[in-house]
Amino acid sequence: DNYWCPQSGEAFECFESDPNAKFCLNSGKTSVVICSKCRKKYEFCRNGLKVSKRPDYDCGAGWESTPCTGDNSAVPAVF
């Protein structure tokens, strides 16, 4: 995926089409499980995280069962 990212202080715009989708994201140094396509875009823009090509290795076996919470799915209104 590749996204247009807003500048700091600009509105973070994203139409959420799948709030329950789960993704294992990785930057080479960090791995995290997040929920929602908008959170995936946010993590790409803010932290350079991309969808892992080896999710079971990067996020651990059973990563798909990670519960969706505000901590791993919420996005700010302003970037």
Swiss-Prot record:
<comment type="function">
    <text>Anti-gonadotropic neuropeptide. It also decreases the binding capacity of calfluxin to membrane-bound receptors of the albumen gland. This leads to inhibition of the reproductive activities of the infected snail.</text>
</comment>
<keyword id="KW-0964">Secreted</keyword>
<dbReference type="GO" id="GO:0005576">
    <property type="term" value="C:extracellular region"/>
</dbReference>
<keyword id="KW-1015">Disulfide bond</keyword>
<protein>
    <recommendedName>
        <fullName>Schistosomin</fullName>
    </recommendedName>
</protein>
